[in-house]
Amino acid sequence: MKIAVIGAGIGGLTAAGLLCQTGHDVYVYEKRNNLDQVGAGVGIGSNVLKALKQYKMAYAIEQEGQSLRKIEIKSDLDEFLNALMMNQDDNLNVTIHRNVLHEILKTHVPKERILLNHKLTEFKQTPDSVRLYFENGVEEQFDLVIAADGIHSVVRTNIYPKSTAKYAGYTCFRGVVNEKLNLEQDEALEYWGHKGRFGIVPLKDNELYWFCTMNAKENDLQFKSFEKPHLQAYFNQFPNEVRKVLDAQEETGILQHDMYDLVPLKSFVSGRVVLLGDAAHATTPNMGQGAGQAIEDAVTLTNLISDRDIESALTRYDKIRTKHTKKVILKSRKIGKSAQTSSTLKIKIRNKMLKKLSSKSLSRKVRFLQKAKLK
């Protein structure tokens, strides 16, 4: 089957690599003139690694990633609240540089099949084909089109004109440092406070990925102008680990993005066009499942196309992925609302509830991620 993938991000490259493995004629179209990745660290859950094992993609990610055993949650006063145990039942979770993950995925797609400077402007469908039109004048026809063109997807906007990114109410800064803290190498740490959150996550070779989130207006000019000294001043009352990480951060290399998600869609399929990853179900990063859910989409779609006729495969993909990713979006949104509250009373209640909850009970709240259907 001749298949086009729109977008060469994590979801698009995973889908292309898997479909190439299973014998399809695949082309990836990327609007940019390069494949450089902007990002810091990314989490890959055990649910995702399990899904990839049958296609021999998991091994390289496990080798290049850092095992993550536990995420400890503390208050901004360094008070222990709870811990999410990650590697239960021998389920491996890893963290990895986004650009390293991207390079791994890229090796599974023939170089000549990734076409840069191809910005999609329009598509037209017949019952059994899709014709694509690009800004550079190229036109091509395919049996199936996979839209993995991100949260601001041109394809999704064409299918659902009213589906636009929904601002979550907070902005996020991120970076990577080489700094030794009083942490186990497989242990992450999050501080939840009145002024926001600060997370510290291990990467391979003693590097640390850090992030912080602060409540803000959309496109807030105050935070757009933030540099290292501003972050140091903002978090100067947070525990010493936070200050050490920010001190270690280079002046350059700090990323800032406002956080968005999508209102869950009723369908990811329109004829022979299928949405995948952020184009279908962009979520806030509170569960660390953005990249993972895109990869799960790709695995599920590949499994189904291998076992069924195209119409049946797309119907099944639509049914199981819309249901599962809706739960992820809403759960992540709920976590963000609780974690980002600046109300003294709500923080007091939240912290008290977290301390009362057992670690096992906390882990059970995300156990549904392990039960995703992949075909």
Protein language model features and the residues they cover:
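Short beta-strand or tight-loop elements
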Residues: 1, 116, 128, 194-196, ...
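Conserved N-terminal helical subregion
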Residues: 3, 20, 45-174, 219-232, ...
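Conserved mid-domain beta->alpha element of the FAD-binding
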Residues: 5-21, 27-32, 146-147, 173, ...
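Conserved N-terminal glycine-rich FAD pyrophosphate-binding loop of Rossmann-like flavoproteins
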Residues: 34-50
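Short, flexible helix/strand-to-coil boundary loops that buttress conserved ligand/catalytic motifs
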Residues: 39, 55-56, 65, 84-85, ...
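Conserved FAD/dinucleotide-binding core of flavoprotein oxidoreductases
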Residues: 82-102, 136-138, 179-254
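Histidine-centered metal-chelating micro-motifs
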Residues: 152-153, 172-174, 196-199, 280-281
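Alpha-helical membrane-targeting segments
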Residues: 330, 334-375
